[in-house]
């Protein structure tokens, strides 16, 4: 298996079953803010840069989907009244994906976005939706207690399987079984904490289908 292709699966998410969330009303009460993730990610203002750890490519992908499909379910990211948890790949994650898809090293954010956009707007939309778990504001502390959880995403009932180790590490199972399991970026959790919509940075793009 191509090493770059294996890196495509190194994604991560901070997850907890909805049933566990129901058992923790105090946590829910602390997340009543309505600032949307689109606001936090500065949708409409993102610019490509040299920072591999931020989310410019993701934001541009969201913008592209909504420009072409204004009624896409992706628009929920701009509705701060709707609770959800999003797992947002860094720019480095998208560069790795673009490199694997094009069989050459993609060094710039603009170049990576071009490769990803070339997959077609419907594919980009599906990939984005696979990174969203609707209906729950999931914080990292809860995620570390969620070993064995299966979370239904916004993509056609597709799920993400969660395994938590003692390291600690949060490892995910997606739909690319031959690739290395994804992991969470523990230094990029609880983005937009205090609001109904939270995000956690991940180090690769989650795959809803096998490559």
Predicted regions and their residues:
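Mature, structured domains of secreted/extracytosolic soluble proteins
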Residues: 2-211
């Amino acid at each position: 298996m191509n090493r770059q292709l294996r890196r495509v699966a190194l994604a991560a998410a901070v997850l907890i079953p909805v049933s566990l969330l129901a058992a923790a009303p105090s946590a829910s009460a602390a997340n009543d803010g309505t600032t949307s993730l689109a606001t936090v990610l500065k949708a409409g203002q993102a610019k490509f840069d040299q920072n591999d750890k931020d989310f410019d490519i993701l934001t541009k992908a969201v913008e592209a989907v909504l420009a072409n499909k204004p009624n896409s379910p992706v628009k929920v990211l701009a509705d701060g009244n709707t609770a959800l948890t999003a797992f947002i790949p860094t720019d480095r994650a998208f560069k790795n994906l673009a490199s694997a898809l094009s069989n050459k090293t993609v060094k710039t954010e603009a170049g990576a976005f071009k490769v990803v956009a070339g997959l077609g707007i419907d594919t980009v939309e599906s990939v984005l939706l696979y990174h969203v778990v609707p209906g729950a504001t999931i914080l990292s502390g809860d995620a570390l207690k969620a070993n064995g959880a299966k979370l239904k995403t916004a993509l056609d009932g597709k799920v993400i399987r969660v395994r938590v180790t003692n390291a600690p590490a949060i490892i995910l199972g997606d739909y690319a079984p031959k690739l290395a399991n994804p992991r969470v970026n523990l230094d990029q959790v609880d983005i937009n904490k205090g609001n109904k919509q939270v995000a956690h940075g991940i180090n690769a793009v989650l795959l809803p289908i096998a490559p």
